[in-house]
Amino acid sequence: LGRCNIAVQQSSGYRRYDCELTAVDTDFKGRFSLCCDSDCTVTLGFISLMPEKTFKGHGLREDLAMMLKNTHAKFIRFPGGCVVEGINEQNALSFSRTIGPVWERPSSQLMWHYRTTNGLGFHEFLQLCEDLEMEAMYVCNCGMSCQARHGGGFSDEETKKYLEEALNALEYAL
């Protein structure tokens, strides 16, 4: 469906290589494969399989954005409850980890046993709200992790960090 050849230079450290693939057809059983000419170790830092054409050019699939638009909702909240709470205070979502180049954003483990890339971050959320002419409702952590999963309250110091993150998010949005 698509192919990209990358000439890799031997290195003892991590090097970034970019490759853009455009599928020439649709195959619901298609696979993404890496092939090497010789024995080597490959470390993948960030892979994104996003469509070339997105809603207003801002990264969201057109069909999903249109579904949201057709709800005629007045606002969208970001992020969701369990994501903002996290499993514990180390992986509770914070504003600063959701902005900047997507390949530099840290991923985090979610309570549903998979990871989020934070590819849809705060900036993309604000852009989506603007594109859909909806109000943005930012949800911040109130100093505790998910109570349904034996979570607990954060220390005063950690809670202050999350409060500062919320203020930074508001400043960013304005």
Predicted feature residues:
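Non-catalytic accessory regions flanking glycosidase/transglycosidase catalytic cores in CAZymes
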Residues: 1-174
